Amino acid sequence: VTCMDVISKKQFDEFSLPYIKKLIDGTEKIMGSRPGAHICGKTSPIWSDLADAGLFSFSIDNCEDLEVAKREVGDRMRFAGNVPPIEVMKDGSIDDVIEACKDCLRKCGDNPKGYILNTGCQLPIGTPKRNVEAFIYAARKYGRGAQLGKLPKGILEG
């Protein structure tokens, strides 16, 4: 599996999608539930394919727009991610982290299939502990009262 920064949609359809479908079906058969996944980079051209393949959730890299994802396939797939791991989590301030978390919750917290606040990719080495703690603080405060299809109470109450 790879992003549209590396291969074309046609190549994805030929070389990745059939195997993604097999992995999803196999995981569901063995584990009893469908998996989630993350693909680094640009993925918007394949969101519908991933939803059609039966992916339970998809972690969106921070280079993509959560509002667009929600609008295009939010009724078919749960999303996670999108807080920038380098610009915000590693290099940003505590306030930057809190604002990025709030922004993601505002954009996708009411996704019909759900949203999991997370970073757009894994945290880089050297990410300050204070920023991880700020992320946890923001998730607890602003993600409070989360329900499918509704903005969390923490966002609504500010």
Where would I find each of the regions flagged by the language model?
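Active-site loop segments of alpha/beta catalytic cores
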Residues: V1-G158
